[in-house]
Swiss-Prot record:
Pfam families: TraB_PrgY_gumN. Residues 1-34 are annotated as: Disordered. The modification Phosphothreonine is found at residue 65. Keywords: Acetylation, Phosphoprotein. It comes from Bos taurus (Bovine). This is TraB domain-containing protein. The modification N-acetylmethionine is found at residue 1. InterPro entries: TraB/PrgY/GumN_fam, TraB_PrgY-like. It comes from the Eukaryota.
Amino acid sequence: MEEPEEQPPHEADTEPVVTSGASEAVPRVLPGDPQNLSDVDAFNLLLEMKLKRRRERPNLPHTVTELVAEDGSRVYVVGTAHFSDDSKRDVVKTIREVQPDVVVVELCQYRVSMLKMDERTLLREAKEISLEKLQQAIRQNGVASGLMQMLLLKVSAHITEQLGVAPGGEFREAFKEASRVPFCKFHLGDRPIPVTFKRAIAALSLWQKVKLAWGLCFLSDPISKDDVERCKQKDLLEQMMAEMVGEFPDLHRTIVSERDVYLTYMLRQAARRLELPRASDAEPRKCVPSVVVGVVGMGHVPGIEKNWTTDLNIQEIMTVPPPSASGRVSRLAVKAAALGLLGYGLYWTGRRAVSLLLALPAARHCLQRLSDAWPQK
């Protein structure tokens, strides 16, 4: 029986503004003393300022894809390369042009800490793969998934070391820009890491796990900034994904395709009509379409476009399948091998230590005295 994973909150604890705004219907500015404005009038005044900044026909980067919801809400998806300076500029320009009501980023609550770190601290953290990080990954995801997460972190550390650029700069820029937009909310739109890694590990055979781990362990190819910027081209990304599908199709499904569905669902949830405040209950309710900016890796953009108008059921991709019989056997074999290696290592170390100890003159002298003192039969 599959056990459903608990779904964490999707809205960041560090939300810039907790009040939602609107995207149309510029209200009239009311005259009078600002100190005597009601809450509704103050809201309308700030909303008008926001809408004046919002461009009707925004000049957007070529990495932005525009999607329209059934109710007229608009979603601007910024496709990014996670180590790219150009992507950071694309995110800033898009948010300033459209003045969104919601910003959704490709992060979950387990990675939200990167929004609070400065560039230097994050660069140092990204380069370090410590025992503490390994223990934390294993506690969160289990042994196999935790080890796989550390291998992927090793890949990220390799890129960080090659480029000297910390990952996730576009998300930090999105967070800062969202805090400058009136009534803009900040949402975490990615599936929780533990769910993704557990489903990925469950989808791979033992041989595929070994093959993938081997490839990640010995990754050492040099990477240039030009390589990262070329990742913003859809044709190159599709070629890379096609190669990945051929070798690890189940891994591509769990890490890319399923997250495409999840990100699409979260963007659609954010793109809902917004209700304007009323001066009194007697006034009729008025709702307007919203404007949303999504910040995701370029590799997810085709999947989001594909899933935008389809019916989505994220419960199917939020469950972790139970381990198979072969999976349980392989885990026991790995644990037995690890214990065997540990036992042999302790035996060899102890034997070597005893040999070195007995080779000392003082130890030989003590043994000789004990032998002389022992009663002979």
